[in-house]
Each structure stands twice: as structure tokens, then as C-alpha cells.
Amino acid sequence: MITMKDIIKEGHPTLRKVAEPVPLPPSEEDKRILQSLLDYVKMSQDPELAAKYGLRPGIGLAAPQINVSKRMIAVHVTDENGTLYSYALFNPKIVSHSVQQCYLTTGEGCLSVDRDVPGYVLRYARITVTGTTLDGEEVTLRLKGLPAIVFQHEIDHLNGIMFYDRINPADPFQVPDGAIPIGR
């Protein structure tokens, strides 16, 4: 079981590496790691379990955040309509995206960052992601809004990118024309 002590913090070199692809079919160890990422995000959203194990709530987690430099992510988030997006993916990849951008009005946070970083993180408003599930199924996901933001945040971790790298240092709250605000 992953707990907060397993999550590495900003400044750790693994968070700046490009993670390695997972050979498919995945090993039992890689399956166990990916399942543990999903278990963490699910458990962290349960107030009772989060309190019991001292888990900081999260809606996504990438393997590099537990010092495993492999291309694996887990996301457990609902959109504005209450639809649940719960996925654990090997080798996720953004295969297409909109020109239009969006941003979280609250800014973004990260389990590997223990400080508030003010500013808007501009993301693609719509993306298509491919990846392989724990069951070995190839999936194609068309995402928008908060789920699209979370997938982009987690896939950034696989490429050594932190969310605050995407904040404009000259004007952290700059909003380009046509960017869609996403509330949380």
C-alpha cells in the first residue's frame, strides 16, 4: 500500500526524468505497482481511509512520484456531470488534442509539491489518450474538462515536467483568448 512516505517530493531527480516505457505484456510487478497507484487515489478520496492512513487526497498519481521511472498513471476523478473516470494505464499517450486551451480556476496542485504555487496552468481543452489497462486492453479515451487536465498533469510526470513549469512566470494568471475556465 502506498502512503505519503512513498511519494517523493519536488527536487528529487526521478521527477525530472523521462520515464521508460513498460514492456507489454506487463510483468506481475508492474501490474502490482500500477494497481497500487490506483488504490492510493481511490483510498485518498475516502475521508475515513485518508484519515486512518494519513493520505493527502489526490485525483491522479504517476509512477515517477513513487520513484519508479516507468510510464504508468492512475486517475480517479469525476467530471462536471458526475461521470467517474477511473483508469490505471500503462504507456499512456496523448495522440491528439484541441487547439483550444483550458485551465483550473483554482490552479493545480500535486502530491509531490508541498507548497501552494499560484497561477494558471494552461492545458488542452480536449485530448485523446491511448494506453493499456491492467487487464491488457488497449483503450482510447476522449477527454475534456477536469479529466483532460488530470490526464495531462499525470502524463507530464512521465516526461519529467512539473505543473508549475507550465505557469507563465511573467504573468502567472494570464488567460489567453478563448481559454475555458474549469471550476473544481
Swiss-Prot record:
**Which cofactor(s) are needed, names only?**
Fe(2+)
Keyword Iron in the entry? The reply is yes
Spell out the catalytic residues: 154
- Pfam entry (one): Pep_deformylase
Gene Ontology annotations of biological process type: co-translational protein modification; translation
GO molecular function annotations of the record: metal ion binding; peptide deformylase activity
**How many cofactors are bound and how?**
Binds 1 Fe(2+) ion.
For this protein, the Enzyme Commission number is: 3.5.1.88
Residues binding Fe cation? 110, 153, 157
Recorded catalytic activity of this chain's protein: N-terminal N-formyl-L-methionyl-[peptide] + H2O = N-terminal L-methionyl-[peptide] + formate
Q: Does the keyword NAD apply?
A: no
Q: Which UniProt keywords apply?
A: Hydrolase, Iron, Metal-binding, Protein biosynthesis
Can you tell me which family this protein belongs to?
Belongs to the polypeptide deformylase family.
Function summary:
Removes the formyl group from the N-terminal Met of newly synthesized proteins. Requires at least a dipeptide for an efficient rate of reaction. N-terminal L-methionine is a prerequisite for activity but the enzyme has broad specificity at other positions.
Q: What is this protein called?
A: Peptide deformylase 2
Organism equals: Geobacillus stearothermophilus (Bacillus stearothermophilus)
Q: What is the lineage of its organism?
A: Bacteria, Bacillati, Bacillota, Bacilli, Bacillales
